[in-house]
């Protein structure tokens, strides 16, 4: 994610609408503006991925745009570019690039502005599939980046499977790992709640059927002494109240789901 959600890339015409030619030429000489390609300029603080997208003639799209806005996405390192249906990409650059292009039509206030959040989510669904869509959707809802109108917009443009995921989504999950676990356990018929406040333990990541606690540690390091001690205290407090706890890190949930699932199912068979 970029430090600033602004794009700071403009066509020369857009720049000239608010500044004189002399002012702009001075900014270019000072390095405050740099030429990306003919007629397109970026601020020296512009997001590197957005600059690369603009060099192709488009904007950030799909998961790249979502990540730029702070929306949780599954690991996908490819650059996604929104070229719109009416854009002409730069063929000399595009042929040599492994970027993923999105050609869906849509309006934006500025030439290189991001797609709307509903459109970003729709691109993710069509490009990356249901799980990637679901974790991004719940993250966008958690961040307040999409409301009822936006959800309705996406619903009208997805198939039955997409609409089902929208209906199942909520705004409670604090990370994509929580969303992913909840989605993958859906078929078991358990009640899986995210961000559950628990006496003496603060807020828990997930709780299954009001008994089994699931903690999903993200990429941040939880191995230092203070984190380890805090986790042990939380687990002991939960056990004191008759609850079991399972902990999984990012790599386990993403790359070893079979083990995670078997552990959860095995523990649930021991439920009192």
Labelled PLM ranges:
Residues 141-272:
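Surface segments flanking catalytic/ligand-binding clefts of nucleic-acid enzymes
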């Amino acid at each position: 994610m970029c430090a600033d959600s602004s794009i700071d890339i403009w066509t020369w015409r857009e720049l000239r609408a608010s500044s004189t030619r002399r002012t702009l030429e001075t900014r270019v000489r000072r390095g405050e503006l740099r030429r990306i390609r003919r007629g397109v300029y970026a601020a020296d603080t512009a997001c590197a991925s957005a600059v690369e997208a603009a060099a192709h003639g488009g904007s950030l799209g799909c998961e790249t745009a979502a990540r730029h806005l702070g929306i949780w996405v599954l690991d996908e390192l490819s650059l996604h570019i929104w070229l719109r249906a009416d854009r002409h990409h730069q063929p000399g650059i595009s042929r040599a690039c492994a970027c993923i292009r999105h050609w869906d039509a849509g309006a934006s206030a500025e030439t290189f502005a991001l797609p709307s959040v509903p459109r970003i989510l729709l691109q993710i669904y069509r490009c990356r599939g249901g799980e990637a869509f679901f974790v991004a959707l719940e993250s966008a809802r958690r961040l307040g980046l999409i409301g009822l109108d936006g959800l309705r917009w996406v619903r009208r443009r997805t198939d039955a499977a997409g609409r089902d995921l929208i209906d199942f989504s909520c705004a409670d999950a604090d990370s994509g790992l929580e969303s992913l676990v909840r989605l993958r356990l859906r078929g078991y018929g358990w009640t899986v709640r995210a961000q559950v406040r628990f006496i003496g333990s603060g807020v828990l990541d997930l709780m299954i059927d009001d008994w089994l606690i699931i903690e999903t540690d993200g990429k941040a390091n939880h191995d230092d002494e203070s984190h380890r001690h805090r986790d042990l205290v939380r687990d002991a407090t939960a056990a004191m109240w008759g609850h079991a706890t399972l902990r999984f890190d990012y790599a386990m949930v993403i790359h070893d789901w079979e083990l995670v699932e078997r552990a959860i199912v095995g523990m649930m068979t021991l439920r009192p």
